[in-house]
């Protein structure tokens, strides 16, 4: 049994959870999310608490699935009540970003501007032309979109130029040592 899944998921005020047709639906002030349930888990809703239990007939994989669905439901509850945000910073001469409608336009030191379509459930804003904020209620979509932005120009280890997550540590390498001796 998963240790985390032994604890109930406490629902904040304004968040409702329901189960319909083998799907869990979480509604809150920021929106609603759905997740298909696996047959290995049973969800119990008691008042303002949600419990995740292994199905009684399952002998194989109960702990893994129980922990997975506890985390998925917990993230859904947090997403519809508070939301998720990832912030990226662009470091480099001439690096800048802008949002034009549903397109994120990046100038990242290549010969052409890089244009990334923004998914419907994600909000993107740019501060000071170099800080990109990705917000949404679905943790997976927010993280995936932020990772796609970062993948366009990963931080390089010599000068640290590129797109990185805010407060991300980039391991730096020393450059070539200059020749100092004569033959």
Swiss-Prot record:
Transmembrane segments: none
Family annotation (InterPro entries): Ribosomal_uL6-like (IPR000702), Ribosomal_uL6-like_a/b-dom_sf (IPR036789), Ribosomal_uL6_a/b-dom (IPR020040), Ribosomal_uL6_bac-type (IPR019906), Ribosomal_uL6_CS (IPR002358)
An example molecular function term from Gene Ontology annotations: rRNA binding
Pfam families, per the entry: Ribosomal_L6 (PF00347)
Keyword Ribonucleoprotein: yes
PANTHER family reported for this sequence: 60S/50S RIBOSOMAL PROTEIN L6/L9 (PTHR11655), LARGE RIBOSOMAL SUBUNIT PROTEIN UL6M (PTHR11655:SF14)
Protein family (similarity comment): Belongs to the universal ribosomal protein uL6 family.
Function: This protein binds to the 23S rRNA, and is important in its secondary structure. It is located near the subunit interface in the base of the L7/L12 stalk, and near the tRNA binding site of the peptidyltransferase center.
Matches recorded under NCBIfam families: L6_bact (TIGR03654)
UniProt-recorded name of the protein: Large ribosomal subunit protein uL6
């Amino acid at each position: 049994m998963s240790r985390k899944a032994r604890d109930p998921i406490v629902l904040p005020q304004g968040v409702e959870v329901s189960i319909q047709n083998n799907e869990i639906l979480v509604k809150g002030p920021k929106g609603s999310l759905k997740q298909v349930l696996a047959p290995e888990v049973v969800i119990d809703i008691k008042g303002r608490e949600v419990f995740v239990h292994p199905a009684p007939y399952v002998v194989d994989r109960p702990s893994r699935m129980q922990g997975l669905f506890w985390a998925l439901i917990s993230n859904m509850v947090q997403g519809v009540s508070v939301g998720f945000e990832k912030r990226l910073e662009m470091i480099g001469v001439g690096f800048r970003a802008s949002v034009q409608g549903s397109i994120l336009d990046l100038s990242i030191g290549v010969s052409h501007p890089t244009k990334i379509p923004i998914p419907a459930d994600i909000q993107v804003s740019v501060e000071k032309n170099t800080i990109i904020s990705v917000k949404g209620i679905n943790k997976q979509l927010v993280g995936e979109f932020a990772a796609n932005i970062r993948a366009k120009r990963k931080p390089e280890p010599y000068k640290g130029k590129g797109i990185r997550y805010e407060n991300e540590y980039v391991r730096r390498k020393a450059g070539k040592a200059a020749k100092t001796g004569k033959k």
